[in-house]
Amino acid sequence: GLGDVYKRQAQRALSIMLNIKWKSNYFESIDPVEARRILDEELFGMESVKQRIIETVIQINRTHTLPAYGILLVGPAGTGKSQIAYLVAKILKMPWTTLDMSSINDAEQLTGSSRIYSNAKPGIIMEAFNMAGESNLVFIINELDKATSSNGNANPADVLLTLLDNLGFTDNYMECLIPTSGVYPIATANDKDKISAPLLSRFAVIDIPDYTREEKKTIFLKYSLPKVLKRIGLHENECLVLDDGLDAVLDYCKDTTGISC
């Protein structure tokens, strides 16, 4: 009967809570030299972006807590915003999860459903804590500027506010307040003007400029090509790229921002 269903769901909620290691929000120091090495190894140029990330590391080392504000990376498509987000998670030595706001159009996807329903389940956010097995977690929020509701239901952007305000997050399935002091959000967006003011106020904005033609050439030869060759099992001396060939590729992709062509 309904009682058995509710009992099973209550047991599941309890097992999820017991599975998560609830950590203190004391944060160990991060080596800024190692952080810089990680950034330089994966990112070409972007000096101002790297500097902002190192400043965040220094702030963490000073306070031994995560900053009150997350990072919002704003720029055209293909400029490496998601890659930067993953690198920050790597530098912080924290597990990470992604929320793709372009595919979330109903707040219940984030908050879960009430246990009064037989098909009830926790929301994406609670499942992320469960998968990570700990409460210190980087949330990489892709396309924050798409965090709106398209079908009249509660706005997912409002739910994100409760995740980011450090007062605790309520999942309808769990029926209790989830501590969020160990949550660090890193969001990406193409257009910050489409993000609500309350949500925008939770982030330090870092602008990611598009690459120049010369920068795209360097990135292709020194970063993209070696990675592709390694993936398909070729040595660099087995693939010769002529200047004319590279120019032809860039001309073909001239209407595309970034390097995602």
What are the roles of these predicted feature ranges?
Residues 15-19, 23, 30-74:
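Pre-Walker A (pre-P-loop) alpha-helix and adjacent loop at the N terminus of AAA/AAA+ ATPase modules
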